[in-house]
A protein has these predicted regions:
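Active-site scaffold of zinc-dependent metalloenzymes
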Residues: 31-78, 91
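Short helix/strand-bridging catalytic loops that position acidic/His residues to coordinate divalent metals
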Residues: 94-100
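Post-HExxH zinc-binding segment in Zn-dependent metallohydrolases
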Residues: 102-131
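Structural motif
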Residues: 74-75, 100-104
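Generic detector of well-ordered alpha-helical segments enriched in charged/polar residues
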Residues: 27-30, 44, 117-124
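N-terminal low-structure segments adjacent to metalloprotease catalytic domains
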Residues: 1-31, 67-68, 98, 129-131
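Active-site recognition of the HExxH zinc-binding catalytic motif
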Residues: 82-94
């Protein structure tokens, strides 16, 4: 597993990201989710996905301007790219909802691009063989 923490100062937001997770990472992931005050249904889904080593799955939970992103192990780079961008989209939508940002406007797209750029140094290992 790879782990990354970063801030988004413009939105006073903190992100905790877990990459390439397996059952061995369950305690760290559950602690992050519980620290954020996640619901029982989200916690159950996360526990099932991670403890059963479900591949090509992800989860994003946000509360109080904090987000936990969990990216499970992928079967190939295409599936990782799908899960990675999918969960980035959820995080960006959570930020947009908190701040009343137009979901059809440029600002949301800049949030998505910014998240992708900050996460790329960690994600690149799973996106291509050359990184």
């Amino acid at each position: 597993m790879k782990y990354q923490e970063f801030d988004i100062p413009k939105y006073d937001w903190k992100v905790y990201a877990f990459y390439d997770t397996t059952a061995d990472d369950i305690d760290d992931i559950m602690m992050c989710l519980y620290d954020l005050g996640c619901t029982a249904s989200i916690a159950k889904q996360a526990y099932e996905n991670v403890s059963q080593n479900k591949k090509n799955t992800g989860l994003t939970f946000s509360k109080d301007r904090q987000t936990c992103i969990v990216l499970g192990r992928a079967t190939d780079k295409e599936n990782f790219a799908h899960t990675y961008t999918h969960e980035i989209g959820h995080c960006a939508m959570h930020i947009a909802k908190e701040y009343g940002i137009n979901p059809y406007g440029e600002e949301l797209c800049y949030i998505i691009g910014g998240l992708g750029a900050v996460m790329l140094p960690y994600a690149s290992k799973f996106l291509c063989d050359c990184c």
